[in-house]
Design a protein with these regions (language model features):
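Bacterial Sec-dependent N-terminal signal peptides
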Residues: 1-25, 38
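Interaction-mediating elements
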Residues: 20-144
Length: 144
């Protein structure tokens, strides 16, 4: 019986700790650079809500727009990814070399997701195809 209570207590503590890692914040609590990015590419009135997540030392931010777009920022407000679900990622966010490549090689599709990884950039097209580029925007490969 003591073991069961100990396990239950551990589970409750774990759930409580996890709950504190993610919470809704005011738009004005975003880093200034993230606010500028949102204002540049959409209307602040389109923001549904903002979440702050804390997985490690630094928080990360997720901005959810009313049209189901999700924009992720690091603790400094640098863009990490934008997922527009089924609509095109706004122009000006993605490097021109990548948008030109997609227009030339995939003219019937558009970019719905853009992610900045540690050593590469990744885009997902409206047909589900994922393309990998180097940090300068040169095509590397199709992701499996």
């Amino acid at each position: 019986m003591k073991k069961i209570l100990a396990v239950m207590a551990t589970i409750m503590i774990s759930l409580t700790a996890f709950a504190d890692r993610q919470h809704v914040i005011a738009y004005t609590e975003l880093p200034a650079q993230a606010q500028t990015s949102v204002q540049k590419h959409s209307n602040v009135a389109d923001v549904a809500y903002v979440e702050q997540e804390r997985d490690g030392i630094h928080p990360e931010y997720k901005v959810y727009l009313k049209n189901a777009t999700e924009i992720d920022f690091d603790h400094r407000g640098n863009l990490q990814s934008i997922d527009c679900q089924v609509s095109p990622v706004p122009s000006g966010i993605i490097p021109e070399l990548i948008t030109n490549f997609v227009a030339l090689h995939h003219p019937n599709h558009f970019i719905v997701e853009y992610t900045i990884e540690y050593r590469h950039l990744q885009v997902e097209l409206s047909n589900g195809l994922e393309l990998i580029f180097d940090m300068e925007g040169h095509f590397i490969r199709v992701d499996d």
